[in-house]
Amino acid sequence: MVVFSEDHIQETRRRGRIEVICGSMFSGKTEELIRRLKRAKFARQRVEIFKPAIDTRYSEEEVVSHDSNSIASTPIDSSASILLFSSDKDVVGIDEAQFFDEGLVDVCNKLADNGIRVIVAGLDMDFRRVPFGPIPALLAIADEVTKVHAICVKCGNLAYATHRITKSEKRVLLGEKADYEPLCRTCYMEALKEETENK
């Protein structure tokens, strides 16, 4: 039988690391983030969750997955604000990280260097397949990367990218299933070709 002392538990809690969960829309990124954070809470770890204040699709003060699972969060405008609320936490979760400024990379490093487990979820590419916001740099410094996949709505294979259905060219357009669809590489290229022909 193994017995863990309180000192051992504290030491284990204070090992900082950065975990990034990325993929297309509808791939389960937020679902996985919520799962990990709820497990940490169950283990009596001190948890704080952040999301960009601009993301009010389902709730202003909760992180909510497309499957309606949710967890209370703190909406913020700047990544620097994360440091103000995190010094006494064991685990920090950050959803929709692609919408934060590039300073998020330094913030995550500082938190991890100070013994905090940081779990970040976000889109790795925008609808044009361009790496999105601070996510590429976070992937580079992460201790662990989990790439999750949606299912292509056209053929049923693993989705590779998010295709925007609406006509807007704005890079940031908060939307749902009426605005975006996950597609595999082949179906994505076919959709682009069709859009070009219809112009």
UniProtKB/Swiss-Prot annotation:
Family statement drawn from the similarity comment of this UniProt entry: Belongs to the thymidine kinase family.
UniProt binding sites for Zn(2+): C152, C155, C184, C187
GO CC annotation, single: cytosol
GO molecular function: ATP binding; thymidine kinase activity; zinc ion binding
Record EC number: 2.7.1.21
Keywords: ATP-binding, Cytoplasm, DNA synthesis, Kinase, Metal-binding, Nucleotide-binding, Transferase, Zinc
Pfam families named in the record: TK (PF00265)
Name the record gives this protein: Thymidine kinase
Top enzyme category: transferase
Record localization: Cytoplasm
Reactions it catalyzes: thymidine + ATP = dTMP + ADP + H(+)
Keyword check for Kinase: yes
Subunit (UniProt): Homotetramer.
Active site (UniProt): E96
Major localisation: cytoplasm
BP terms from Gene Ontology: DNA biosynthetic process; thymidine metabolic process
Binding-site residues for ATP, renumbered to this chain: G23, S24, M25, F26, S27, G28, K29, T30, D95, E96, A97, Q98
Keyword Membrane applies: no
